[in-house]
Amino acid sequence: MSKGQVIQVMGPVVDVKFEGGNLPEIYNALVIEYKSDAEEAPTSQLTLEVAIQLGDDVVRTIAMASTDGVQRGMEVIDTGSPITVPVGTVTLGRVFNVLGNTIDLDEPLPSDIKRNKIHREAPTFDQLATTTEILETGIKVVDLLAPYLKGGKIGLFGGAGVGKTVLIQELIHNIAQEHGGISVFAGVGERTREGNDLYFEMKDSGVIEKTAMVFGQMNEPPGARMRVALTGLTIAEYFRDEEHQDVLLFIDNIFRFTQAGSEVSALLGRMPSAVGYQPTLATEMGQLQERITSTNVGSVTSIQAIYVPADDYTDPAPATTFAHLDATTNLERKLTEQGIYPAVDPLASTSRALSPDIVGEEHYEVATEVQRLLQRYKELQDIIAILGMDELSDEDKQSVSRARRVQFFLSQNFHVAEQFTGQKGSYVPVKETVKGFKDLLAGKYDHIPEDAFRSVGRIEDVLEKAKDMGVEV
């Protein structure tokens, strides 16, 4: 192992000089051990990642933690490989930082645990799975109108308090319970409070045992926030490649991954490109996204929360992400105001999988008819607001009546929200979802009150609820 010396510290950027031409490779992890002021840890260890070889035996590195206490002249050791993180079933139920160290104050991991490098090649062309298989979530609005593909990439758009976290928890719960699947959650630039809340909520709902969590919090240096997504992905890849599992990878927030990359790029002195972003934006995004895919032995399906700066979808950060997405799930605040949960906008959400070749003719026809009906209802809302329902034609009155039932039937009780709602959660298979909406569109349930359709699972639950309301079914 070659050794060097710190010659310059500029915030999270550290320059290191090595003697005798023993320069570490790009992405190699370097370690500095130094005395700390903290009583509980008299020596601190700082990990650096090599970013640029400057010449004259000097490398420029990015720190993965605070550089407080680092001085010129300190000894630096080249580990000889990129950052490695723990992988395997031992990671389930645990919380890690970017370096794969546990931060949940639980039992330490065994010393002989397997570790993988966070920088890896994407699967080769011949390893990719050629089938397009739907990932059943048990959530009606998703399965019917914007179905997810196994090994696909889904963008989850939504503001604060519209139900992103609850939707994420339910997806983790359903895949863990119904499919026995593994989930990995990567908090990228995450608020510490949000990550803390999510951990305890998942612990209470019992899904933590099937989940590995990785956090690079908002207060950490940009190097940690940029690499933490790769740490989560590396853990997920192991379950796909070695355990042959279908894995769900959540990244919140992919915009903060881009933002951290932009900060690092500026610190390294690169010339910025459009809107001040890094010139390597598309490359960095591609390196991450291309590793999230289905192979012949398993799949990594990614659900990514995406912040859109100033609601500008042409901003380079979301625009670059769009190129990689197979489906988008848009959460709408207006629906939460109506008490419709999950508040997924059925008209704005899209999916590449919604085609007759993938979901089948019947599913496709029912989904497009639902969208057509809801679009017509949206067009009529202005007229209703000004003139009232009486001014509509009989056909439009029927459309509005059915559209409202459809809208309410797209809502659903969640297992992870049982403690708040007092109502049992429901998992609805795709076949039952399609049949329920097909009968609803055909007018079979026009006599059932609208409220019977709100926050239920199967169509049988609607009929049961209607009976309780004293309606003949």
Swiss-Prot record:
<dbReference type="InterPro" id="IPR027417">
    <property type="entry name" value="P-loop_NTPase"/>
</dbReference>
<keyword id="KW-0406">Ion transport</keyword>
<dbReference type="InterPro" id="IPR050053">
    <property type="entry name" value="ATPase_alpha/beta_chains"/>
</dbReference>
<dbReference type="InterPro" id="IPR003593">
    <property type="entry name" value="AAA+_ATPase"/>
</dbReference>
<keyword id="KW-0375">Hydrogen ion transport</keyword>
<keyword id="KW-0813">Transport</keyword>
<comment type="function">
    <text>Produces ATP from ADP in the presence of a proton gradient across the membrane. The catalytic sites are hosted primarily by the beta subunits.</text>
</comment>
<dbReference type="Pfam" id="PF22919">
    <property type="entry name" value="ATP-synt_VA_C"/>
</dbReference>
<dbReference type="InterPro" id="IPR020003">
    <property type="entry name" value="ATPase_a/bsu_AS"/>
</dbReference>
<dbReference type="GO" id="GO:0045259">
    <property type="term" value="C:proton-transporting ATP synthase complex"/>
</dbReference>
<keyword id="KW-1278">Translocase</keyword>
<dbReference type="GO" id="GO:0016887">
    <property type="term" value="F:ATP hydrolysis activity"/>
</dbReference>
<keyword id="KW-0472">Membrane</keyword>
<keyword id="KW-0067">ATP-binding</keyword>
<dbReference type="GO" id="GO:0046933">
    <property type="term" value="F:proton-transporting ATP synthase activity, rotational mechanism"/>
</dbReference>
<dbReference type="GO" id="GO:0005524">
    <property type="term" value="F:ATP binding"/>
</dbReference>
<dbReference type="InterPro" id="IPR055190">
    <property type="entry name" value="ATP-synt_VA_C"/>
</dbReference>
<comment type="subunit">
    <text>F-type ATPases have 2 components, CF(1) - the catalytic core - and CF(0) - the membrane proton channel. CF(1) has five subunits: alpha(3), beta(3), gamma(1), delta(1), epsilon(1). CF(0) has three main subunits: a(1), b(2) and c(9-12). The alpha and beta chains form an alternating ring which encloses part of the gamma chain. CF(1) is attached to CF(0) by a central stalk formed by the gamma and epsilon chains, while a peripheral stalk is formed by the delta and b chains.</text>
</comment>
<dbReference type="InterPro" id="IPR000194">
    <property type="entry name" value="ATPase_F1/V1/A1_a/bsu_nucl-bd"/>
</dbReference>
<keyword id="KW-0547">Nucleotide-binding</keyword>
<dbReference type="InterPro" id="IPR005722">
    <property type="entry name" value="ATP_synth_F1_bsu"/>
</dbReference>
<dbReference type="Pfam" id="PF00006">
    <property type="entry name" value="ATP-synt_ab"/>
</dbReference>
<dbReference type="Pfam" id="PF02874">
    <property type="entry name" value="ATP-synt_ab_N"/>
</dbReference>
<feature type="binding site">
    <location>
        <begin position="158"/>
        <end position="165"/>
    </location>
    <ligand>
        <name>ATP</name>
    </ligand>
</feature>
<protein>
    <recommendedName>
        <fullName>ATP synthase subunit beta 2</fullName>
        <ecNumber>7.1.2.2</ecNumber>
    </recommendedName>
</protein>
<keyword id="KW-0139">CF(1)</keyword>
<dbReference type="GO" id="GO:0005886">
    <property type="term" value="C:plasma membrane"/>
</dbReference>
<keyword id="KW-1003">Cell membrane</keyword>
<comment type="similarity">
    <text>Belongs to the ATPase alpha/beta chains family.</text>
</comment>
<keyword id="KW-0066">ATP synthesis</keyword>
<dbReference type="InterPro" id="IPR024034">
    <property type="entry name" value="ATPase_F1/V1_b/a_C"/>
</dbReference>
<dbReference type="InterPro" id="IPR004100">
    <property type="entry name" value="ATPase_F1/V1/A1_a/bsu_N"/>
</dbReference>
<dbReference type="InterPro" id="IPR036121">
    <property type="entry name" value="ATPase_F1/V1/A1_a/bsu_N_sf"/>
</dbReference>
